[in-house]
Structure formats: C-alpha cells, structure tokens
C-alpha cells in the first residue's frame, strides 16, 4: 500500500529515536490509522544509520504463550543480536541467545539478562539500540515463575533501559486504548512514559491524495465527508478501477458497518437500550468529552464499544469518538432506524 502523507509523524519519530533515551514512548491511535506503516517507514529511512532496530510485530501472531514469546523475541546464535531472517524488506534485528540455552527452564531474570546483554553489545559496537513492540498488550496474559506477569515486569525493564540508564529507546505501538488507559493511570509509569497520537488523516491531505489519483472535484467533495483512514483511500482507488463509483463504495461500507454494529448489540448480554443511549451521544457530533459528557454508570457500555472497536478513546486528550468517520455514519444510520 502506498505511504500516504504522514510527514509530521515520520519526522517526529525519526528525530525521537536519535535523542537520548529518557522514557517509554507509547504510539497510539485508532485501528488502521497507520501506526505500523509509519514506524516501518522510519526504520526503512534510517536503515543506513547507526541505529539497530529490534522490531517485534505481535499482530502477526495469535496471542502468544510463554514459549512462543521466547521464540518470537530470541534467535539461537553465537551473536548477541542478529538480523531477523524472516523480514526481507526491513533491516530489523532479534536478540541473540546461545545455541545450548535451555528455554524449558528459563526464568524471567534470565530473559531480561539476555535482553540487556544484547543491548549492551549493540552499544559496545558503537551503535544505538531501539526496541519497538507492535501490539504489546498481547503479552498481558503471560506469566513466568511464581506467577510474575511478563508485561508488568517488562515495564520495569523498560523504565530501567530508558529513564534510569538511558541505554535504549523503547517504543510501544497499540490501538488498544483501554490498555493505554491502564498504562496512563499506572503510577509507576507516570513519570517514565510519553504518548504520541497517530490519528485520522487530515482532510487537506485526503484531498491532495485523491486529486493525485485522478478523482474529479465532485468525487473528492463527496469523499471528504466520509474518509479518514489510509486503507480506505486504497480500497476506494481499487474499487474505482473495478468500475464501482465513489458513492457505491462508501454506501456499501456504511451498510456493512451498520449491520456489524447492530449484530454486536443484538448478541450482547448488556442492556440494549443503554448501549443505544450511549451511541446517541454521537447523533449530532463526532466526538464527546469524557469528563463532561460521560456518566459513571455509562462506562461499562462505553468500554464495551471501545473493546469492540466501535469507539476510540483518546485517554491523553480526554476525547471519545468513533474509530473512523465512516463508523460515525454507520452509528447515525442505526440510530435513525
């Protein structure tokens, strides 16, 4: 898929990884807003620099077990870090571990010791390590010896690597905003974390892209009311090549989204009337303010809609909105029926 205009986000992250590590960076945003694409572009554009990227994309895997976590993050080798052979187009690395290392009896402290060894070796080689984990929250149900939570202990390690020792940048990408909410309210991370939002595309950028792709003024004006995410533009371009009009494509999207939302509500054990009451907050506006517009008793319905990717919660700015503009129109459609 073409890399659409994300120069602001691209430059921010390129500059960020070249500063001294001082905090964990959480890059968050609505699903499909382009977080992973931007991060991979950063890695690609800096592949000839002295930065060594350890990039782990957990969205590629089913929710991993302890053993799978170890095989994802480590490669048996006589080197402390080595190129990931499975990634052909990106120069990214994995942590190295001895050939005879026994994964069956490994303790969490051993895991962290090996990560530290790899990072320190990168630094000794005159290079700068950056650890990137995409969809980090998928590790939240993994426990090691004595019931230790892998994710909680990883956060402690990340604080040590960044804020305390300034050895390595740690960047975590996620679209799970309830996970971000938990992190944001975690007192042990409050002074050691930063947050960066990659949100919907701006209308001016969408207009420019569509013009470059040969859409006429009428089509562009229509699209600007509905588009917000990069993949939507790609689908729209492909559908036009297949003979579908802009109106047909977008109406089809909204119908599919509306049917999906209705099915979700119809099959939920939650109070249907209360869910619709929450959705009605978006009948006349695309976003609401968490502090002003949400009551305590509404939170379980809000959470339900966030968990099912109907709504997006920007915890840092206190805003709740649909995950996309087309989702907003789907919400409005089911409210009108």
Curated annotation (Swiss-Prot):
Belongs to the archaeal ATPase family. ATP binds at residues 29-36. This is Uncharacterized ATP-binding protein MJ1076. Keywords: ATP-binding, Nucleotide-binding. SMART domains: AAA. The keyword Chaperone does not apply. One of its GO terms (molecular function) is ATP binding. Signal peptide: none annotated.
């Amino acid at each position: 898929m073409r890399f659409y205009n994300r120069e602001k986000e691209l430059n921010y992250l390129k500059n960020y990884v070249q500063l001294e590590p001082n905090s964990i960076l959480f890059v968050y945003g609505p699903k499909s807003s382009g977080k992973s694409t931007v991060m991979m572009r950063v890695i690609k554009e800096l592949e000839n620099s002295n930065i060594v990227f350890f990039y782990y994309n957990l969205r590629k895997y089913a929710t991993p077990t302890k053993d799978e976590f170890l095989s994802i993050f480590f490669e048996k080798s006589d080197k402390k870090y080595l190129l990931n052979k499975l990634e052909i187009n990106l120069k990214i690395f994995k942590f190295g571990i001895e050939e005879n290392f026994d994964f069956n009896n490994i303790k969490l402290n051993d895991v962290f010791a090996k990560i530290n060894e790899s990072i320190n070796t990168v630094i000794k080689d005159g290079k700068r390590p950056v650890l990137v984990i995409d969809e980090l929250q998928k590790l939240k149900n993994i426990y090691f010896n004595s019931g230790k939570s892998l994710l909680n202990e990883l956060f402690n390690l990340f604080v040590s690597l960044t804020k305390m020792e300034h050895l390595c940048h740690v960047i975590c990408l996620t679209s799970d905003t309830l996970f971000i909410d938990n992190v944001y309210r975690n007192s042990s991370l409050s002074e050691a974390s930063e947050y960066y939002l990659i949100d919907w595309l701006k209308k001016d950028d969408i207009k420019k892209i569509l013009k470059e792709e040969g859409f006429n003024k009428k089509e562009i004006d229509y699209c600007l009311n509905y588009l917000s995410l990069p993949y939507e533009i790609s689908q729209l371009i492909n559908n036009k090549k297949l003979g579908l009009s802009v109106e047909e494509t977008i109406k089809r999207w909204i119908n599919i989204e509306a049917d999906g939302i209705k099915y979700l509500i119809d099959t939920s054990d939650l109070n249907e009337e209360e869910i619709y009451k929450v959705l009605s907050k978006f009948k006349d506006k695309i976003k609401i303010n968490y502090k002003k517009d949400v009551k305590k008793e509404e939170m379980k319905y809000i959470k339900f809609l966030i968990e099912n990717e109907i709504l997006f919660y920007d915890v840092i700015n206190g805003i709740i909105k649909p995950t996309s503009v087309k989702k907003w129109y789907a919400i409005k459609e089911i409210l009108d029926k």
